[in-house]
Amino acid sequence: MIHPAARRVFVFVPLIAASLAAQTATYFPSRGHWAPHQSPAELGFDPAKLQEAVAFAQANGSTWDFDRDQVRTFGAVLGPLPKQRAVTNGIILRHGYIAAQFGDTKAADPVYSVAKSFISTVCSLAVERGLIKDVNDPVARYIQDGGYDSPHNAKITWKDHLQQESEWEGTLWGKNADFVGAEQFGRGERKAREIHDPGTFYEYNDVRINRFSLSLARLFGKGLPEVLKTDIMDPIGASPTWHWYGYFNSTVEINGKPVESVSGGTRWGGGLWIDSEDLARFGLLILNHGRWEGQQIISAQWLRDATSPSAHGPDYGYLWWLNTQQKQWPHAPKSSFAALGNGSNCIWIDPDHDIVFVWHWYRNAALDGMIERILAAVQQ
């Protein structure tokens, strides 16, 4: 549905233009409260066309079923899964205001690999604090838990992990990084192949991302959910309903205390469970170069680096999906980028039009069509 504010009577075009000119400053919602709301017309949208986009989204909800699809697609489950999920839901922001929303946007569900972009953002804090001197440094220089002892793994840098080019070898939480074996990996199993040097080959690989997550937890000396909550989610006014889970067997000892190492997705259960409204806040933070009102929470330089394509990935940055070649989403600007997860789930960010679009539980092939319709609704 179009946001209730859209039901106001139409105003003359000069008044709309004046409204747009007056709202050059981005609106940042306070904790638990997203107001004042603006109508689509006041935000530069054609209300009828925006309603068409919402109708398209509602017609393209996911058919994903945890009981039917999870194990056969991904293999043996290691962590929690919800008993049921919400239906498709989402939010369209412009200039920080809600232009449209649909479905239950307060349903905190797993977002699968959207969590990877959160790991990237948490890593930025380690760099800013000097815990990581340079992303080109070998991880082994910082982490001595046996995971980087081999001559091959000793070459892996933080940047290799960030770009999914680590080629880390080993087993973590009962899953081998080679993804060989249907029991453990379901339809996602892969054939054995030659391992390449770190930094020379891209492979989307959750075992290696989970290794990266564990390394960051050891570096911070605490669980990543604690870091995320204290340094990112609380400052942007996120709700208390989100949770970031690991696996039933992923608890380690750090500084003499048990810490659950969290996963970079929900492929084997666990992962980040979060609602569309909190995802929209996070997306708004990223859209505004890491700044929330007067506070610089994430380094703007980090975000520039994170949204620059790697040498070997499929238009991929630091665990963010890019569109520099306009292959991901042909109807989207080259500057747009996204956090993507199975299900499907996304945070799509469009700096050219100052838009954040969050979509929970949609058919993967529908995203470009949805983007096309959102942008067709933009008038100015």
Label each region the model flagged.
Residues 46, 96, 110-135, 161, ...:
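Active-site SXXK
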